[in-house]
Amino acid sequence: RYNKIAVKSDFIAVFSDFSGGRFKLKKLSRYIKILALALSAVLTLCACSGDGASSGESSSAPDYSLDTSAKVGYVYNEEISRDNMTYMFEKSRKDIETALGLETCYVDGVAVSQFENAVKALKNEGCSIIVSASHVFANSALSYAKKDKDIYILSYGGTASLTNLTTFRPKLYQPAFVCGTVAAWNSASHKIGIVADDLMYCSNGVINAFILGIQQIYKERETDVEIIYAETKAQTETAVNTLEGKGCDVIFSYQSDDYCMYYCDSIGMRSIGFTNDMAYSAPKYGLVGYYLNWATFITDTVRTCINDNFMAEVYVGGFSEAFVKLTPYSAACKKETLTIADTLYDYVKKGKAKIFEGEIRDKDGLARVGAGATLDDMQVLAMDYLVYGVTYIDNIIDPVPNPTTSDLIVKKEYVS
């Protein structure tokens, strides 16, 4: 019979090893496994439980600005919806109106080829500050900012800045890494599926971080990772059904909407995905969601524009800046999940755990990151390979010969 006090002392001893500073992930993996085994024993024999709290921290609202004459326009690649990534930007649009008292508007469904015309449409409506709300616009935003110095542009996903252009990028690989641990701990079949859009921001980096997170619990080939690239709802359903048929019992989604989670929930499949509202996206079988929390950053940057103290930068934010967050872990998770995942979250947030620390091999076994080396954000963004552990890959995305374009109508309404 286990002794609660003795086990608790073991936990303290385990974690005290890390108090001296940074450690290697291989060492972390070993301790997470020790923690997992101990937790399992304690929870089974002593009926302990977690509290289900969220890992994220909240940001305070900015003060009102005196100058309310400026107008802010958003350019969206997709049509705005509660179900896709635009919803995370819409929160920032509301915050700008509430915190700064400014008027905002947007153009949605904009193709890359329409970016300049979309900006001009917003400019004609009086907008002097533009939020380029998709990474696919990064090059277009840079080009436009070079020739129009009368406006400020905040560009998502860009890698360069100008006197009137600031860019911001999220470390989405950080929550993906923790999510990998959640998936591994909640998988009984040791087969985990990924449904992703390969045109998403930092697609390989996010997927690789998720796989490396799995490997914090299981060794490289102790769990099969099977990937299907899909974009539309029909393709997503096909992908999920295929992965379920191959024995996967947890699905990780990296797409611009939450439909994969919704569909997984409808068939009783556990899922993890890009959402800030698990109760909306996957109320029954969703494990955890990850999302972008950039409203405060965007609002503060807009304030610098209207107060004439704009400072161009290339901003990269992660857990420590509360720029990316995790939702609370759901009741569908095993009870041990909270402690295991939050332990890893805390180390990543504090910079003690380096996600992409070598040696890292690609799916074919070729060393891509040498022992002791660590990739920086730009190197993660440039990853053109998948890490070792992937056992199946398929791409069912069909090219769209005549993609729809925007009518470039400037709108103000919010989605409910």
Model-derived segments and spans:
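Bacterial signal peptide processing site
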Residues: S49-D51
